[in-house]
Curated annotation (Swiss-Prot):
Annotated transmembrane regions: 5-25, 35-55
Protein name: Transmembrane protein 300R
This protein's GO CC annotations: membrane
Keyword Disulfide bond: no
Source organism: Invertebrate iridescent virus 6
UniProt subcellular location: Membrane
Keyword Transmembrane: yes
Length: 61
């Protein structure tokens, strides 16, 4: 995988994490699809890991 693709993937992961955070901050009753909670939690975790990766990656350059 080329570095540019990896960077793009990481940025998309961060965006997914942001969406996940918005989803998880809405009250449980108001959520459009309760089965998405698991995936949204996963996307938040992935987003945080992606942010850490991007910060470490750009320090080296």
């Amino acid at each position: 995988m080329k570095k540019e693709f990896l960077d793009l993937y990481m940025i998309l992961s961060v965006l997914a994490g942001v969406i996940g955070i918005f989803y998880l901050t809405t009250p449980y009753q108001d959520r459009p699809d309760k089965s998405l909670s698991y995936y949204m939690t996963l996307s938040v975790v992935t987003g945080i890991l992606a942010l850490i990766y991007l910060q470490n990656h750009h320090k080296k350059n």
